[in-house]
């Protein structure tokens, strides 16, 4: 039997997940008295932005976050090196339209700068500096281009060149695990082709830390921190969200937690989600 590989486009279309978000219920209209119009779960960038937009639309909203801070994977640490250091998300793509870049540019507290080109980096193999003669970028471009141009729903490992090259394992880690979060055997060339064709500008960085920028951008957004969601009951009209601080009733629930949280089973769904959705949490 042919193995099916995960495609984020297909995942978003079939599981109602956009920006890692699920909505419950999708069609049900509630006539009951509810605590809120919408309960947003997760105060990462997606959850915070959704909360802001819903408030602007006149909705009664509550945003719940299990940890003690907002920002999700956008988190700046100032203790490790004595300088701002992003432990998660650290650059901004699509500078012409990126709202975080616009916020940073319009706020004197932040200094944004373009990422330096690859020629500005020094690469080492052990204690030996890698020179241009090593053709590491040729290998990178060859592997990346081959995956992107394949346009088929097959695993990259079936088509990528340079598999005997000394830099193949490095590129496997870079293009596979680092860029896509999966090994070459576990995602689709068709999916990578979609990402590859999206026009992007040079990445931008924030001297003060991208995590800090996100926290400042949404510092007035109302969020209930240290509130862990245990169960989402969407069996009736509206939804009931059970947390470690009590129950919350709403017309709709918007979930923006990571796929890691969804696949861990930490949040119970009643009734259970479809097998297709459950499997997609583990494959994406």
Predicted regions located by residue number:
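FAD-dinucleotide binding site
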Residues: 2-284
């Amino acid at each position: 039997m042919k193995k099916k590989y995960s495609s984020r486009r297909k995942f978003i279309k079939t599981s109602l997940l956009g920006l890692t978000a699920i909505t419950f219920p999708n069609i049900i209209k509630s006539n009951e008295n509810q605590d809120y119009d919408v309960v947003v779960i997760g105060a990462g960038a997606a959850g915070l932005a959704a909360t802001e937009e819903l408030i602007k639309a006149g909705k009664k909203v509550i945003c719940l976050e299990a940890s003690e801070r907002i920002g999700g994977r956008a988190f700046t640490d100032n203790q490790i090196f004595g300088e701002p250091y992003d432990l998660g998300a650290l650059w901004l793509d699509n500078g012409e339209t990126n709202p975080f870049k616009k916020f940073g540019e319009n706020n004197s507290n932040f200094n944004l700068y373009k990422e330096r080109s690859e020629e500005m980096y020094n690469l080492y193999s052990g204690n030996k500096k890698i020179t241009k003669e090593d053709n590491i970028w040729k290998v990178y471009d060859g592997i990346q281009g081959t995956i992107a141009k394949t346009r088929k729903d097959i695993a990259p490992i079936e088509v990528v060149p340079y598999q005997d090259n000394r830099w193949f394992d490095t590129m496997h880690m870079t293009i596979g695990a680092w860029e896509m979060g999966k090994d070459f055997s576990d995602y689709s060339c068709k999916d990578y082709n979609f990402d590859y064709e999206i026009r992007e500008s040079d990445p931008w960085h924030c001297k003060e830390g991208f995590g800090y920028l996100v926290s400042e951008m949404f510092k007035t957004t109302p969020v209930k921190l240290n509130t862990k969601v245990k169960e989402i009951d969407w069996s009736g009209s509206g939804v009931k969200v059970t947390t470690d601080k009590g129950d919350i009733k709403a017309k709709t629930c918007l979930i923006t937690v990571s796929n890691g949280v969804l696949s861990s089973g930490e949040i119970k769904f009643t009734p259970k989600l479809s097998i297709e959705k459950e499997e997609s949490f583990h494959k994406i």
